[in-house]
């Protein structure tokens, strides 16, 4: 009696489907390539790449606390002063240079150093496009008749004797003339000061500075984009003695991220060539008639065609595109050959019969459950990622899931038809390459017969069985597994968290070098962070309320991670000394205060309602102790102070986006991995409905992924959205190894361990090798993003082999009872007089 389970339903469906394909192969060979060609043609004729310019937001979740705070800050206080309103970084245009002194004294403020600074500044100011675009014509101005918005040091460097003009500016962190303040904290790097000469505002004369940063803030226009492109192409050629030049711009990170994809393109043809050669070689044998090189070639062709069709369809539908997607073809094409090895193994295991058509149908039906499981688990692991909160994860996983869907559809149609013709060629005794020529099959001598039954994989499987079967060996495997698990968990616990912007660009990128220099040279003072206080329910006419607000301002800036910078109420109270007002008198006094220099800038720090009442106000703080290690403590301290105050509001800094992203990433990784494992386990239970075996599958999947995370941590990979994609991907990949092993174990009645190893050793080794070869060439690409994917694939492959051929078979043979047996689906075949369609490949 046939077993009524999901596996038998899948097998029966493929029996009927393969019957149609084998009898009428021509339509299935023609239609998929025509469909692919049609999709590509539609895409090319209406080509438009839907890419986003919000580089940082691509790697942020759709909704998180700091992102909501940023949107409210932008709504209530639209940026008007690019030097003060630094939260406008997402929309502003700028370039900047950093010149670091490499001489023995390490002081860029020496006479020769200032001359080098002046030459660099004049070089940047002198850059001009063929259309006449330059800094002067594109710089940001507060008013049309005013000079460019630049630090006074820029004007000093244009002087004929800049070394004298600059001397008047050398105080740190600020230079103060009465009520006029010049911010030097972001200009001078690695500063040494004269602490004994500190003034009452905490500013000291600069004794030396190793580096100087010059920022050029620009208007948003097409001419600005052209000039920035000119700057980025010209500045790498600029050289200065005893100096190192760093540079960046508002579009640099986006352009360098795109270069990750560009670095992959030259490797695509080489990877395809290597995989084609490997697959054709793996499908060949010493028996020339049984060699199937074209099956290997068309397996690669099928995977490539599916990748092209799926990508073209998504582009035609205007689905977003990211440079990260360039990694997808390498993964999909590599795993696309796995099913081919299973199908070929099944074909070679079937006995010769009078009805060769039925023989092929039987071979395909026998491997149908495994084929379906491979595609379903890989596809679902990416499908889970395609509903992620992160834009980059969602886009990448959608492209991968769509490619796997097309690959499965083309596999059961196009590739099945091609393989049926190749098998007919083998049965008719034609040449494997020159199919028109018949060849005389070699005489089936005793040596050849022994060779056909005992190939390399069979020898490996038999030796593996002899090693694993004795009880002492099983105990040894158990302790090896415990050591593996302990080491993996130890490293996984220490996995560094959070996105490091330096790693988004290629290793040799000028952006990575500039970000590293920024952390090294300008770590003491950073940009501004902000606090927003909603004022609907408070009355500022009350001096106690004003005093409490100033107290909040002092508390927020009272840690080692931030210091007070500007708050309009501070000078207002110093002027009015806690005076009590009526509502109208306070309003008049405030407007008088804001109407005169140097308080005009505070107009942008107060939001008024249509009725003239204060709706919200903004405080500014200077960020201290730059670096990712201090971002989380800063966010925690400032948010806690705001929450414990009596006022309604929030604090915001650009680094808070990365802090929140870090916490959201951890949560999403846990949710996605658990969801993926539960989904995979549900599918595996459907395919192998046996409780103990299902428990072994779940344990093995979890073990593989713990090992992958531990291995990633050991190679200094961070838990960010890049590794998040790869971890979710590894869940689907790991299922392929452990479930096939379990399935082929439970369908055996006796000698289960040996038969399972004999069946699974060759496909596991071949598919693992093809997957590893497919991405191995990418190890030469110097990019953290690419390196993370390559490492993950290698780890999954290595641990998959370890579990699929050693840990899991031993576990199954030890704890799965003989009663937990599953009857495999037996297809309906015409030659009932010989129902045993399988050769005795086990040698038992």
Swiss-Prot record:
One GO biological process term: molting cycle, collagen and cuticulin-based cuticle
SUPFAM superfamilies: Multidrug efflux transporter AcrB transmembrane domain
Domain of life: Eukaryota
Residue stretches making up the SSD domain: 264-421
GO cellular component, one term: cytoplasmic vesicle membrane
Classification via Pfam families: Sterol-sensing
Gene3D superfamilies reported in the protein's UniProt record: Multidrug efflux transporter AcrB transmembrane domain (1.20.1640.10)
InterPro entries: HMGCR/SNAP/NPC1-like_SSD (IPR053958), Patched_domain-protein (IPR051697), SSD (IPR000731)
Family, per entry: Belongs to the patched family.
PANTHER family in the cross-refs: PATCHED-RELATED, PATCHED-RELATED PROTEIN 9
Protein name as it appears in the record: Patched-related protein 9
Organism: Caenorhabditis elegans
Organism phylogeny: Eukaryota, Metazoa, Ecdysozoa, Nematoda, Chromadorea
């Amino acid at each position: 009696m046939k077993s009524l389970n999901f596996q038998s339903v899948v097998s029966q469906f493929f029996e009927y489907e393969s019957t149609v394909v084998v009898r009428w192969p021509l339509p299935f060979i023609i239609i998929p390539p025509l469909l692919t060609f049609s999709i590509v043609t539609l895409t090319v004729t209406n080509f438009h790449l839907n890419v986003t310019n919000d580089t940082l937001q691509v790697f942020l979740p759709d909704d998180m606390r700091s992102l909501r705070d940023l949107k409210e800050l932008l709504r209530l206080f639209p940026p008007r002063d690019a030097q003060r309103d630094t939260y406008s970084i997402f929309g502003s245009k700028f370039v900047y240079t950093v010149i670091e002194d490499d001489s023995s004294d390490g002081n860029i403020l020496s006479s020769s150093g200032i001359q080098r600074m002046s030459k660099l500044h004049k070089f940047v100011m002198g850059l001009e496009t063929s259309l006449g675009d330059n800094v002067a014509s594109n710089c940001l101005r507060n008013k049309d008749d005013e000079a460019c918005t630049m630090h006074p040091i820029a004007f000093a460097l244009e002087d004929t004797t800049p070394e004298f003009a600059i001397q008047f500016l050398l105080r740190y962190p600020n230079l103060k003339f009465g009520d006029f303040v010049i911010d030097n904290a972001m200009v001078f790097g690695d500063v040494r000061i004269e602490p004994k000469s500190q003034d009452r505002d905490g500013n000291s004369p600069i004794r030396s500075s190793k580096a100087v940063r010059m920022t050029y803030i620009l208007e948003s226009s097409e001419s600005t984009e052209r000039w920035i492109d000119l700057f980025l192409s010209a500045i790498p050629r600029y050289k200065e003695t005893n100096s190192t030049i760093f540079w960046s711009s508002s579009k640099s990170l986006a352009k360098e991220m795109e270069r990750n994809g560009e670095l992959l393109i030259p490797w695509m043809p080489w990877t395809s060539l290597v995989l084609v050669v490997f697959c054709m070689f793996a499908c060949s044998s010493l028996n020339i008639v049984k060699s199937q090189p074209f099956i290997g070639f068309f397996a690669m062709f099928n995977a490539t065609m599916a990748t092209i069709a799926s990508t073209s369809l998504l582009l035609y539908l205007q689905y977003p595109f990211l440079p990260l997607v360039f990694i997808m073809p390498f993964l999909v094409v590599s795993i696309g050959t796995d099913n081919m090895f299973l199908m070929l193994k099944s074909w070679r295991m079937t006995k010769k019969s009078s009805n060769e058509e039925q023989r092929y149908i039987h071979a395909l039906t026998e491997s149908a459950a495994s084929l379906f499981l491979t595609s379903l688990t890989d596809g679902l692991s990416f499908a889970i990622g395609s509903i992620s909160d992160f834009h980059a994860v969602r886009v990448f996983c959608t492209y991968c899931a769509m490619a796997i869907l097309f690959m499965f559809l083309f596999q059961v149609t196009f590739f099945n038809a091609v393989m049926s013709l190749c098998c007919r060629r083998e049965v008719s005794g034609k040449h494997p390459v020159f199919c028109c020529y018949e060849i005389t099959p070699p005489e089936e001598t005793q040596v050849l017969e022994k060779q056909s039954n005992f190939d390399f994989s069979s020898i490996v499987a038999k030796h593996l069985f002899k090693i694993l079967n004795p009880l002492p060996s099983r105990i040894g495997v158990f302790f090896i597994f415990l050591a593996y698990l302990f080491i993996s968990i130890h490293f996984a616990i220490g996995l560094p968290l959070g996105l490091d912007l330096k790693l988004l660009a290629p290793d040799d990128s000028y952006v990575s070098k500039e970000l590293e220099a920024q952390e090294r040279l300008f770590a003491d003072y950073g940009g501004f962070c902000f606090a927003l206080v909603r004022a609907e329910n408070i009355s500022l006419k009350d001096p106690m309320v004003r005093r409490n607000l100033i107290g909040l301002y002092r508390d927020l800036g009272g840690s080692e991670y931030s210091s007070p910078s500007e708050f309009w109420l501070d000078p207002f109270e110093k002027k009015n000394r806690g005076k009590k007002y009526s509502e109208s008198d306070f309003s008049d006094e405030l407007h008088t205060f804001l109407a005169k220099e140097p308080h005009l800038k505070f107009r942008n720090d107060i939001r008024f309602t249509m009725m003239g009442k204060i709706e919200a106000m903004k405080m500014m703080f200077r960020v201290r102790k730059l670096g990712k290690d201090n971002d989380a403590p800063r966010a925690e301290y400032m948010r806690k102070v705001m929450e414990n105050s009596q006022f309604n509001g929030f604090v915001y800094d650009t680094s808070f986006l990365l802090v929140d992203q870090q916490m959201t990433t951890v949560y999403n990784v846990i949710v996605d991995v658990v969801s993926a494992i539960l989904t995979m386990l549900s599918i595996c239970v459907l395919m192998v409905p046996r409780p103990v075996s299902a428990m072994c599958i779940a344990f093995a999947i979890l073990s593989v992924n713990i090992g992958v995370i531990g291995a990633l941590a050991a190679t200094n990979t961070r838990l960010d959205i890049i590794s998040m994609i790869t971890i979710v991907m590894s869940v689907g990949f790991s299922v392929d190894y452990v479930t096939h092993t379990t399935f082929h174990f439970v369908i055996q009645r006796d000698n289960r361990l040996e038969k399972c190893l004999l069946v699974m050793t060759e496909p596991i080794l071949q598919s693992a090798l093809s997957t590893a070869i497919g991405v191995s060439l990418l190890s030469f690409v110097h990019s953290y993003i690419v390196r993370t994917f390559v490492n993950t694939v290698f780890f999954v492959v290595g641990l998959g082999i370890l579990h699929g051929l050693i840990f899991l078979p031993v576990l199954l043979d030890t704890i799965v009872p003989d009663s937990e047996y599953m009857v495999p689906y037996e297809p309906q075949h015409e030659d009932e007089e010989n129902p045993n369609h399988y050769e005795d490949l086990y040698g038992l």
